[in-house]
């Protein structure tokens, strides 16, 4: 949880803490804990609003999290190549600078909105809301939110997504779930990417990586995938198709689901999180739609 480095203040919410803003109060250039709590409460409100939009339009929103270079963008490219003809997809890309990843996605014929976060090491719900103004939600079935490459902060911020997917690439080492538990506890699915490198990176043991994951009491599926070998994305594609079907069912029943927000972040979220922090698969009644 970034409660000391100040990166809770992002381009999406800085208007709330500027002079005259609703929560304008700082100490020694860093946001006070009470201000951070207020910002997170505002973030949670905006996330609920985002989720209402997704549910009303029948869109499944998935937040992709990983370290830099784990293969998030390449995974999206490969996914679009397979699902694109049958599933309408859009992507929100989060990076500190450049439009490189968004340009790669657009080259696949899919609408993509780039969010440049500046010094912020994660996306927040306000940033995502601003990006949604550039996306026709009636024209898509599936929205991927590619978060900033970071193994800590993204897990503590609800963006309005329905599911979290955490990537662990083979070159990173199989002990990452033990070293960075927060982001792996938040996952509804863990993908071990770059599986084609296993024969040459023999120190990486997928079974050991999964044991580290289970030691966190995670029940998330753990699948080894590769974008370079035909058929090795199938576990991911099956999971996506199942989630799309589940979203259709929830919408018909007027229900929604919330992602896991990790306790270290949730402690600062204040009253907005009371009664909302549930485990995997818990259904919630959707709030009333509004503009």
PLM region spans:
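Nucleotide-state-sensitive switch-loop elements of NTP-binding domains
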Residues: 12, 21-52, 56-65, 70, ...
